[in-house]
UniProtKB/Swiss-Prot annotation:
Pfam families: bZIP_1
Composition skew (Basic and acidic residues), residue ranges: 22-39
Summary of the function given for this chain in its UniProt record: May contribute to developmentally specific patterns of gene expression. Binds specifically to ocs elements which are transcriptional enhancer found in the promoters of several plant genes. OCSBF-1 is able to bind to a site within each half of the ocs element as well as to animal AP-1 and CREB sites.
Organism classification: Eukaryota, Viridiplantae, Streptophyta, Embryophyta, Tracheophyta
Protein known as: Ocs element-binding factor 1
InterPro entries per UniProt: bZIP, bZIP_plant_GBF1, bZIP_sf
Tissues expressing this chain: Roots and shoots of young plants, and basal portion of leaves.
Miscellaneous comment in the UniProt entry for this protein: A derivative of OCSBF-1 that contains only the 76 N-terminal amino acids is still able to bind to the ocs element.
Any single GO BP term: positive regulation of DNA-templated transcription
Family per record: Belongs to the bZIP family.
Species for this entry: Zea mays (Maize)
Length: 151
């Protein structure tokens, strides 16, 4: 194949200036269309980049809020754990005092013959001592009850 056979004007006569002007006009029109298309494409890319930058800023702000909240919760957890440790020690101390008082009351009851109302210790497995635990095992929803879930 020769290079002249690949030319878009191959097979045309060189005397047809009307076709050449039309080809030039089409090429110029296509060039302008391509420029406009490229400009719109750059504009879309810039808008997308701006949106991504805004999203990054929003996500960083959200991340900072979540991190601050996590720090607050961690400090509250530490404070509550310390308070629980103090309360457990106090409960153990009060339990010891109750046992001592009960022993004294039993001795008084034994030697005086007067019946005493002796408060016995609360059992160690008392659910009131475990407020965050259920006093009974959590039962799963029966599989045969899907009719109960109406939205």
């Amino acid at each position: 194949m020769s290079s002249s056979s690949l030319s878009p004007t191959a097979g045309r006569t060189s005397g047809s200036d009307g076709d050449s002007a039309a080809d030039t006009h089409r090429r110029e029109k296509r060039r302008l269309s391509n420029r406009e298309s490229a400009r719109r494409s750059r504009l879309r890319k810039q808008q997308h980049l701006d949106e991504l930058v805004q999203e990054v800023a929003r996500l960083q702000a959200d991340n900072a809020r979540v991190a601050a909240r996590a720090r607050d919760i961690a400090s509250q957890y530490t404070r509550v754990e310390q308070e629980n440790t103090v309360l457990r020690a106090r409960a153990a101390e009060l339990g010891d005092r109750l046992r001592s008082v009960n022993e004294v009351l039993r001795l008084v009851e034994e030697f005086s013959g007067v019946a005493m109302d002796i408060q016995e210790e609360m059992p160690a497995d008392d659910p009131l001592l475990r407020p965050w635990q259920l006093p009974y095992p959590a039962a799963a929803m029966p599989m045969g009850a899907p009719h109960m879930l109406h939205y």
